[in-house]
UniProtKB/Swiss-Prot annotation:
Signal peptide: none annotated. This is Glycosyltransferase 8 domain-containing protein 1. Glycans are attached at N102, N181, N245, N253. It comes from the Eukaryota. Residues 1-4 are cytoplasmic. The gene is glt8d1. It is an enzyme of class 2 (transferase).
Length: 365
């Protein structure tokens, strides 16, 4: 064989080897992309917004503290204000994972571009809820799709081992690192604040039934609930603020358990009629029945959105609270809420002018 033929053979072999390597790499890339897609269902994660903006303050270093919060269009101001209160009261490296709907991405991005908040925007796909919530028109009016985002925390935070979930109607006055460091017992997925604790019991709403026990959320006359063997007078907990061990969450298939009870309720109407508009608490009460840890009650001082909340809490107590929660009808960006001056302290005006808090003195001008 001549030298020329040998060179040709070697060249052909090199080309074949290159094509084999290229083919394998393409297969690996395809597998990677498929895995990424499955990890982020039912939403997609958009890239960091503030990390790449020039002229910003130096980003905080150290252990990341993931915080998941939702931001529906009509309440974007609530989410931004809550996040700002967290950022300003801590030096921790907090990453805000904001779940919103597709139509709110531009508005939210514009607003956040005026802040120093380190964040990711996650677009939630409401179709994931098909068959999991009642189709009754009257009930559907009170259902907000984003309220179920907390059920999918591991999908939105695939790399996090531990994270915090917060409702948007909160203000944080303490260092969020303290809440993040809440100790969870072995085998426990999450830590909540119970409704019977000394702080929240001051704000129990009169006339709202048994709002601090399981019977206020579940219909114990239904056979499916009876079979669970739960005690109706068991103290309930508030799922608007919690710390989650996401590794344990995935191992125990918590999302699947929550979806199971959502589907059962859609077919059998298992939730209590007392709080018909509360769709997220009942399945969580079932899944975490006597199997959760507790957070410090001062990290969820709630019922500030209830009638007469201003008479239930002293100014000194509210000032000492680590986290204020306006769960209830009256929100701090509305006209008749208690302690709205505290919320105003952390409010960042909407650069688009679409959102603004309602205030009496403004209306009277």
């Amino acid at each position: 064989m001549t030298v020329r033929r040998v060179n040709v053979v070697i060249l052909v072999l090199l080309v074949v080897a290159f094509l084999i390597v290229l083919h394998r790499n393409l297969l690996n890339l395809n597998d990677f992309l498929n895995q990424e897609t499955s990890d982020t269902v039912p939403g997609m994660i958009l890239p960091f917004e503030t990390d790449f903006l020039l002229g910003r303050k130096a980003m905080r270093s150290g252990e990341e503290i993931p915080v998941l919060i939702t931001a529906p269009e009509e309440r974007l101001g609530a989410a931004v204000t809550a996040m700002n209160s967290i950022y300003r009261n801590s030096k921790a490296n907090v990453v805000f994972n904001i779940v919103t709907l597709n139509e709110s991405v531009v508005h939210l991005s514009t607003w956040l571009s005026k802040t120093d908040l380190k964040h990711k925007i996650i677009v939630f796909d409401p179709s994931i809820l098909l068959g999991k919530i009642p189709t009754d028109a009257q009930k559907m009016e009170t259902v907000r799709p984003l309220t179920f985002a907390r059920f999918y925390m591991p999908a939105f935070l695939p790399d996090a081992e531990k994270a915090i979930y917060l409702d948007d109607d909160v203000i944080v006055q303490g260092d969020i690192r303290e809440l993040f460091n809440t100790s969870l017992k072995s085998g426990h997925v999450a830590a909540f604040s119970e409704d019977c604790d000394s702080a929240s019991s001051k704000g129990i709403v009169r006339g709202a039934g048994n709002q601090n026990s399981y019977i206020g959320y579940l219909d114990f006359k239904k056979e499916a609930i009876k079979k669970l063997g739960m005690r109706a007078n068991t103290c309930s907990f508030n799922p608007g603020v919690f710390v989650a061990n996401l590794t344990e969450w995935k191992q125990q298939n918590v999302t699947s358990q929550l979806e199971f009870w959502m589907e059962r309720n859609a077919k059998e109407d298992l939730y209590s009629k007392t709080l018909a508009d509360c769709m997220t608490t009942p399945p969580m009460l079932i899944v975490f029945y006597k199997h959760h840890s507790n957070i410090d009650p001062m990290w969820n001082v709630r019922h500030l959105g209830a009638t007469g909340a201003g008479n239930r809490y002293s100014a000194q107590f509210v000032k000492a609270a680590k986290l204020l929660h306006w769960n209830g009808h009256y929100k701090p960006w509305g006209r008749t809420s208690s302690f709205s001056d505290i919320w105003d302290k952390w409010y960042i005006p909407d650069p688009t002018g679409k959102f603004h808090p309602i205030r009496k003195h403004v209306e009277e001008k």
